[in-house]
Curated annotation (Swiss-Prot):
The lineage of its organism: Bacteria, Pseudomonadati, Pseudomonadota, Alphaproteobacteria, Hyphomicrobiales. This is Coenzyme PQQ synthesis protein B. May be involved in the transport of PQQ or its precursor to the periplasm. Keywords: PQQ biosynthesis, Transport. The keyword Repeat does not apply. InterPro entries: Metallo-B-lactamas, PQQ_synth_PqqB, RibonucZ/Hydroxyglut_hydro. Pathway: Cofactor biosynthesis; pyrroloquinoline quinone biosynthesis. It comes from Methylobacterium sp. (strain 4-46). HAMAP family: PQQ_syn_PqqB.
Length: 299
C-alpha cells in the first residue's frame, strides 16, 4: 500500500492568502524553516496504479500537478483516481470536488450525513450522476472503494461543518458528521483522522496496533489562534483536539501501540510549522512526525 499526503495543512493552507502571522510571513518570504503547505488531502493505492482520494481539497488541482502518480496517463481523458472518500463536509475537504467535474468517472463515498450535506448545496450537481456515482457508506462496515483496499469508517468526536452551523453547535458528539478511516491492504493498516475534537477510549481501541496513524494536528495549544492574535476560536470550538497539554493527542495516545505517528491538518498558527523550533522538537521527541506536502509512505 502506498499513501501520499497531498495536503498537510488545515483550512486556508500555509501561508493563508491574507495572513501575516509570524509563520505565514516566513512562508511568504521563502524562509526554508516554514514549508508552504496546501489544504488537507490524502491519496492511497494498493498497487500504485489505481488510487483513492481521501478528501477533495480546494487545492486539489495544484496537488495533482505536484504528484506524477496522479497525472492523466492515457487517452484524451484519464485519471488514476477511481474513487473519492470524504471524512466530513468541511469546505477544505469538499470544495475540490468542483475541480473534479470534467466528465471523469469516479465513485464518491461518504456517510449518509456527509452525502446529504453535499447534496444540500446544488453547486455540487456539476458532478453529473452519469459520471460520479454517490455511494453511501455505513459506519463500522468494511468496503472496497478500489480493488485491493479495505476501508472501515468510524465515528470520532467532532461537529457539523462551519457552513452548516446554526446557533451554538454541539461539539464532541460521535456521529456520521465526522469520521476516521481505517485503510487496510496487504496486511498493513493505516488510520486517517484529520479532524477529532477529543481522544476517547473507543478511539484508542480502534487505533491500537495500526502501522501508521495520520492524526489531527490543527493546533499545538487549544488557544493557538488567540495567542497569535488572528482569531477568537479555540481548537475545541473548531472541533480539534490540541497536540499538547492535558487531554492533548500526544498524551492521550502515548500508551497506545502505534507504528508511525504523523500529524496532519496543521493550522497556520501552529508553531510546529517552524522547523527546529521548540514546539517542533517537543513533538518529535514524543515520537511524532509533522507532515509536509508530498510525504510518501509505503506500507
Amino acid at each position: 500500500m502506498q499513501a501520499i499526503i497531498l495536503g498537510s495543512a488545515a483550512g486556508g493552507g500555509v501561508p493563508q492568502w491574507n495572513c501575516r502571522c509570524p509563520h505565514c510571513t516566513m512562508a511568504w518570504a521563502g524562509d526554508a524553516r516554514v514549508k508552504p503547505r496546501t489544504q488537507s488531502s490524502l491519496a492511497v493505492s494498493p498497487d500504485g496504479e489505481t488510487w483513492l482520494l481521501v478528501n477533495a481539497s480546494p487545492d486539489i488541482r495544484q496537488q495533482l500537478f505536484a504528484t506524477p502518480a496522479l497525472h492523466p496517463a492515457r487517452g484524451l481523458r484519464h485519471s488514476p483516481i477511481a474513487a473519492v472518500l470524504l471524512t466530513n463536509g468541511d469546505v477544505d475537504h469538499v470544495a475540490g470536488l468542483l475541480t473534479l467535474r470534467e466528465s471523469q468517472p469516479f465513485r464518491l463515498h461518504a456517510t449518509r450525513n456527509i452525502l446529504d450535506s453535499v447534496s444540500a448545496n446544488r453547486v455540487f450537481d456539476v458532478l453529473a450522476p452519469e459520471h460520479v456515482a454517490r455511494r453511501e457508506v455505513a459506519l463500522d462496515e468494511s468496503f472496497a472503494p478500489v480493488p485491493g483496499l479495505a476501508v472501515t469508517l468510524f465515528a470520532v468526536p467532532g461537529k457539523v461543518p462551519l457552513w452548516l452551523e446554526e446557533g451554538t453547535p454541539e461539539i464532541g458528539q460521535e456521529t456520521e458528521t465526522t469520521v476516521g478511516a481505517l485503510i487496510e491492504a496487504g496486511g498493513k493498516r493505516l488510520a486517517y483522522v484529520p479532524g477529532c475534537a477529543r481522544v476517547t477510549d473507543d478511539l484508542r481501541r480502534r487505533l491500537s496496533g495500526v502501522d501508521v496513524l495520520l492524526f489531527d494536528g490543527t493546533v499545538y495549544l487549544d488557544d493557538d489562534m488567540i495567542r497569535a492574535g488572528v482569531g477568537t476560536k479555540t481548537g475545541w470550538r473548531m472541533g480539534h483536539v490540541p497536540m499538547t497539554g492535558e487531554g492533548g493527542a500526544i498524551a492521550a495516545l502515548a500508551e497506545v501501540p502505534i507504528g508511525r505517528r504523523i500529524f496532519v491538518h496543521i493550522n497556520n498558527t501552529n508553531p510546529v510549522l517552524v522547523e527546529e523550533s521548540e514546539a517542533r522538537r517537543a513533538v518529535e521527541a514524543e515520537g511524532w512526525t509533522v507532515a509536509h506536502d508530498g510525504l510518501t509512505l509505503t506500507l
